[in-house]
């Protein structure tokens, strides 16, 4: 078959597929109207840079996992706030029945516009999510959490009944169904997950996430979030130092990490990240305990500089813009980059 005949045969096949399944069901990659991946900021400057595209990708499945009180829900609430700032409609499937509206509001979430559901079973939660995604009107949906998606058979059964792998089967079936709708509607779907310990592991990490392996495969981005220390004001603990690692990334190089502060009552400290990344990129000069920007001293001590940036949003935004611009041109800004990951 000559090249011309091949081209005609392919064109005929494409026309037949479009006739059967609709326009846009198949095309050459270069014909796609938007090859660049759209993203939504995470609310963390360092994490946006570590993800490689300025945030989490639209139309993909995201998994955020970590130990208890590590900042999983805080990070997802920041995601909602950032999506709402861009005019997006967000939904929160609260399977844990633990969402605090007052805290969400403090983090910038417009709770009046946030769609919330507190389902009774895992099947109900995932059916609600599927209906919302297929509507095409939802830009982001959060499912909190995979561990709380308890199958109906387990809820209706007796205490102590063995329900082997029922949750894993539920997740596998749901993700097969959801994936096409998520891609078609460009809806960001975030699953919050918990960590469990595998028994009898001699080598490698004994940690694993709940809900089987399906989510690990279907997720385009997996983010591991950990609390690594406390932030104190004299003797009072006012926040936690947090490290996130992008353990899987299908849209950019994976295994990058970022550090940020989560302040109790106000969430991720944007000013703290601007200072740390500004110093790493030589945008902010540090001499002893003094910090300077454009050769002008802006404060002594990190906490004082954070307050200065809060009081001067124009300068804060200016430095943030420079950090984003410079980080896109620099391949390594002292982010740790792991070489392997243990599930």
UniProtKB/Swiss-Prot annotation:
Any Gene Ontology biological process: SOS response
Keywords: ATP-binding, Cytoplasm, DNA damage, DNA recombination, DNA repair, DNA-binding, Nucleotide-binding, SOS response
Name of the coding gene: recA
Single GO term (MF): ATP hydrolysis activity
Protein name per the record: Protein RecA
Main location: cytoplasm
Function per UniProt: Can catalyze the hydrolysis of ATP in the presence of single-stranded DNA, the ATP-dependent uptake of single-stranded DNA by duplex DNA, and the ATP-dependent hybridization of homologous single-stranded DNAs. It interacts with LexA causing its activation and leading to its autocatalytic cleavage.
Coiled coil: none
CDD domains, per the entry: RecA
Gene Ontology CC entries for this record: cytosol
Compartments, record wording: Cytoplasm
Disulfide links within the chain: none
Residues where ATP binds: 66-73
SUPFAM superfamilies: P-loop containing nucleoside triphosphate hydrolases (SSF52540), RecA protein, C-terminal domain (SSF54752)
Family according to the record: Belongs to the RecA family.
InterPro entries linked to this entry: AAA+_ATPase (IPR003593), DNA_recomb/repair_RecA (IPR013765), DNA_recomb/repair_RecA_CS (IPR020584), P-loop_NTPase (IPR027417), RecA-like_C (IPR049261), RecA-like_N (IPR049428), RecA_ATP-bd (IPR020588), RecA_C_sf (IPR023400)
Lineage of producing organism: Bacteria, Pseudomonadati, Pseudomonadota, Alphaproteobacteria, Rickettsiales
Top-rank taxon: Bacteria
Record organism: Rickettsia bellii (strain RML369-C)
